[in-house]
Curated annotation (Swiss-Prot):
Domain Fibronectin type-III: 1-109, 110-210
Keywords: Repeat
Keyword set includes Cell inner membrane: no
The name this protein goes by in its record: 45 kDa antigen
Species annotation: Taenia ovis
Domain of life according to the entry: Eukaryota
Amino acid sequence: EFPDYEQPIERTVVEYPSLRDIFAWEPPTSNSIGLTWQRHAFPGVEREVLTLKAVPTSEPNNTKTAYAKLGSGKVTLDGLKPNATYLVTATANISGDTILVLSNTFHTLANGTNIINNIFHWGPVTNQSIQVRWDQIKPEETSALIVTLTAEMASDPGVERSESALFGKGKVTVDGLESDTLYIATVMVFRNGRQYFNSTRDIRTLKSGHKEVTVVTTSGSGIASTILGLLLTCVALVLA
């Protein structure tokens, strides 16, 4: 016997205060869009179905649909067109009743685009600190990842500060820097001591105050095939 699912979905996932803690959109590629969720959040109804539908804004009749059981924790919709805008909707049904609707608008990437550069967001920068933020995805797979941010003074490479944080924290900040000074800032991702990704920016701290980062020059490298799918450019759930 299933419980009464006519109430809002929060009743079926009492361990979580918000749907934002359960579902996360995967970054669009040139031909796919995906959604992940905590697969243990639906006890007793793991075999019920979640539907993911993508409607291109330029061709509303050319709809793509994919299905997955709630217990699987993931659904991916393939066969999309590159460089196209889609309205994507996820619906979950239990015993014929719709208990969840999530929607978002995505633009697929053009062919050949390197999406790994969209994971991390530099800033804000103050007169004494540099921060880098990153988007969350697949908590069950990324809990062991460590992100390290290093700031090296460009004029004196021997002067360096570094801070680390677990991936789930979403940001790391290096403090104690000199004001109005150019630093070589490097963000690195590690798992079990092995480096999987690094990206470098030349960033000048402010004379005073704080603002979003101004990148002076850019360089970076990454191993996209070993980043465990950490390619989320946004986690946005619009509940209807």
